[in-house]
From Swiss-Prot:
Family in the record: Belongs to the glutarate hydroxylase family.
Cofactor(s) this protein requires: Fe(2+)
Subunit-level organization: Homotetramer.
Protein name in the entry: Glutarate 2-hydroxylase
Amino acid sequence: MNALTAVQNNAVDSGQDYSGFTLIPSAQSPRLPELTFTEQTTNRFLEQVAEWPVQALEYKSFLRFRVGKILDDLCANQLQPLLLKTLLNRAEGALLINAVGIDDVAQADEMVKLATAVAHLIGRSNFDAMSGQYYARFVVKNVDNSDSYLRQPHRVMELHNDGTYVEEITDYVLMMKIDEQNMQGGNSLLLHLDDWEHLDLFFRHPLARRPMRFAAPPSKNVSKDVFYPVFDVDQQGRPVMRYIDQFVQPKDFEEGVWLSELSDAIETSKGILSVPVPVGKFLLINNLFWLHGRDRFTPHPDLRRELMRQRGYFAYATHHYQTHQ
């Protein structure tokens, strides 16, 4: 455990009853509660949002908040405060979420609606330049010729934060499994900063606060480089991070060596969690103190996985970087 922060008591209260959903600790970590919407809640939500196709949510951004309110109302208005409490709690900051009855690629639009409702109870999802929408769907196949590790199946996608090549702060990341065929492996990998045994060493290094250049490959549809330090602090002085090894561009030998050592220290951490995410489930994490990645897949000629992501900002609290807004 890192000396800079201490884990508080787990916020998951197994004795508390919620309306419309259940909440239990996940099998992987007490930092990662698992929230499940009941079958009745799921069915009633889908019935009440059926009049709006996904295209309506794309064109009319206020509808994203409307579907969020519908879901929260179905949960007796207990959902929104629970989501915010968990995501902003440094001891947790993450959820594994699913809805009973949503578990097939034929329900892809319903998955987008559900994830959109949840995300817009805590904030707003940013424009995703890769897709041109507030969310992005992408497919991983057995053979890939893209310009980043996002879709490459036979190697580990290293741990990183999202939103590293854009100017907006990315407070949260939502990652949903839409489809999976002929898949073995490929678990989500997560690392909480306070479980990273080398955090003190790198957070206190002179290069930790030096602005560095981040540049995205062409597939991201972002042409402007951004500059910021890898580490910063939140409002309480605790370490937060904004880093991805693929896109950071060291300007000299000193930065290059330090970044290489940083990457090795992250990837070899004993605090990494391996989390299976079945079709229909999604992870929702605080992007400022959780890093995420993906384990490798076992090769198969018909391998296919489709994912959906949303990433955005919290609208109900300011937990941004303090020295490099």
